[in-house]
Amino acid sequence: MQELIRVVILAIVQGIAEFLPISSSGHLVILGSMLGELGESVTLEIILHAGTLGSILVVFWQRIWALLLKDRRVIGLLVIGTLPAVVIGLTIKTQFPEILRSPLLAGAMLIVTGVMLIVLGRLTPKSGTYDRLGLGAAFLVGCFQAFAILPGISRSGSTILGGRLMGLDRDDSVTFSFLLAIPAILGATVLAIKDLLEDGSSGETSIEVLSIGAAVAFAVGIVALKWLIRWSREDRLHWFAYWCIPAGLLVVLLNLR
């Protein structure tokens, strides 16, 4: 029962923070440092990523279907936009893996996320659409996504800000952000599977508990994603800065003691 409760806690955090601009990686690192080895299971990481990936596929299935049928140029934009995260992600994972588990860095980057959200709230609305985005602009949005490899930097907040700076309107900046998330989450899942195979252990968590975790992450993710879309249309995403900055300051202060 204790393991089930811990998995459900992680699934809820993953489902909320994967989509709302508050950084799932940062919160999981901080939560793991508070509660011990809560977030260290590679198998659980794969399962929770699969749950939130399912949320994206459900919410954006019409856009994804359109990409496969007629908007194939956008697939090229997504490939270009994914390259920075691949290069930087592999570099950090292989050369500096310790920073991905640093609660101090996660706290500091939560503050940066809060500042980015404040900047986002001050931008003048534009009318660009993601299907008209240039290759260079897609690459730059991808650089914003690569920045979010650091724990505490929100992937959604960073890429939505990048899209808005490239001239996208509110809806399309959100849509492009989460279309970019599909290869990013798939890539993270593949790396996690690779680590799992090299480690040779799937952990002690039962299939039933893992299934519940995936279902919780999936359901919470759908709610969080729809919440983000609604608040983006209402220009409220900067409100999350009031969580990120105080939380980040608190984590930094606690880890500097």
Swiss-Prot record:
- For this protein, the parts annotated as crossing the membrane are 4-24, 41-61, 74-94, 103-123, 133-153, 173-193, 209-229, 236-256
Q: What is its EC number?
A: 3.6.1.27
**Which cellular component terms (GO) are annotated to the entry?**
plasma membrane
- What reaction(s) does this enzyme catalyze? di-trans,octa-cis-undecaprenyl diphosphate + H2O = di-trans,octa-cis-undecaprenyl phosphate + phosphate + H(+)
Q: What class of enzyme is it?
A: hydrolase
Q: How does it sit in the membrane?
A: Multi-pass membrane protein
Family indicated by similarity? Belongs to the UppP family.
Q: What else is known?
A: Bacitracin is thought to be involved in the inhibition of peptidoglycan synthesis by sequestering undecaprenyl diphosphate, thereby reducing the pool of lipid carrier available.
- Protein name per its UniProtKB record: Undecaprenyl-diphosphatase
